[in-house]
Regions:
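Conserved hydrophobic beta-strands of the Rossmann-like cofactor-binding core
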Residues: 10-12, 84-92
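N-terminal Rossmann-fold cofactor-binding loop
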Residues: 15-16, 40-44, 64
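Residues at the C-terminal ends
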Residues: 28-32, 79, 134
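Conserved glycine-rich Rossmann-like NAD(P)H-binding loop of the short-chain dehydrogenase/reductase
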Residues: 33-49
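Conserved Rossmann-fold cofactor-binding substructure of NAD(P)-dependent oxidoreductases
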Residues: 65-80
Length: 160
């Protein structure tokens, strides 16, 4: 047994995009300690692209831009898995569909969407799952340190 005591604990990890994702590294670390990991990904398309990587792991779709999908995820996880011991929110999004622009050219709607998905969704997830969390559960968010990045590298995501 490790000092983390994660054996037989159950976690929801949100945001696996590929095998290089921080969320995937967290999955591997949790599983190595004996934890059960449930996943949520943004879309059915993403789920399909991750089929081989995810194997038999429980994986659900949830686009956190839509609160009703967060509520539906909590309901489904509760029905299939019961309580959970922690949530890892490793989700970030920025609309770069028009290409990378200078920071000062960021549109308000794009900045607010990025903030809603990348940051505020943590609040909505915690609220939706509060009845499923064990008394000693933890909810964590993974982000970048804006002291180590510049607007040139991350565009308007740097301050988020």
């Amino acid at each position: 047994m490790s000092f983390l005591n994660l054996q037989n604990k159950r976690f929801l990890v949100m945001g696996v995009a590929n095998r290089k994702s921080v969320a995937w590294a967290i999955t591997q670390a949790l599983e190595a300690q004996g934890a059960e990991v449930i996943h949520s990904v943004r879309s059915a398309k993403r789920l399909e692209s991750l089929k081989k990587l995810m194997g038999e792991r429980s994986t659900y779709c949830c686009d956190v831009e839509f609160p009703e999908q967060i509520e539906a995820l909590a309901k489904e996880v509760g029905e299939h898995h019961g309580t959970i011991d922690g949530i890892v929110h490793s989700i970030a999004f920025a609309n770069f569909s028009d290409g990378l622009k200078p920071f000062h050219a960021t549109l308000r709607k794009d900045f607010l969407q990025a903030t809603s998905i990348s940051a505020f969704s943590l609040v909505e997830v915690a609220n939706a799952f509060k009845k499923l969390l064990t008394n000693e559960a933890s909810v964590v968010s993974i982000g970048i340190s804006s002291t180590d990045v510049t607007a040139e590298n991350y565009g308007y995501m740097a301050p988020i």
